[in-house]
Amino acid sequence: MGAAIAAAGLGLVYGGARVGLMGAVADAALAGGAEVIGVLPAVLTGREVEHTGLTKLELVPSMHVRKARQVELADAFLVLPGGYGTMDEMVEVVTWAQLGLHTKPCILFNTAGYWDGLLAFLDTAVEAGFVKAKNRGLVQVAASAKEAVRMVMGR
């Protein structure tokens, strides 16, 4: 994904760690010449090993400020497979879009069907009346890195 982002001439805004899936994405984006900005809460510098090779690393006071800053810096949100932190960020971004606080796309990279369960839940939430049908479209889906980058670019 990082190579595809760089090849498209895009930059990357992410959490700022050098470990895990996003650390690998950041490394690939950097290797391809992309600008990569990390936003890391200062309290996590002892837990998440900050990436020292980024174009820019911003230390912020809290997780809340981190998410707000990432929303401010990003033009779109591409959600890769992940756990609770990924879910937290994705749900907040979609909620803010639902409230009209931004109009930036949120795209799930559904590699190997990773997000199928979440997508089924969203459909159930619409059927049950907890999510408006028009808001279901706030979460877009890409099956490949190429498709995800095209969607980020609005194509």
Tell where the protein language model's regions lie, with residue ranges.
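Glycine-rich beta-alpha loop segments
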Residues: 1-35
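Short, acidic/small-residue loops that bind anionic groups at enzyme active sites
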Residues: 40, 80, 94-120, 133-135
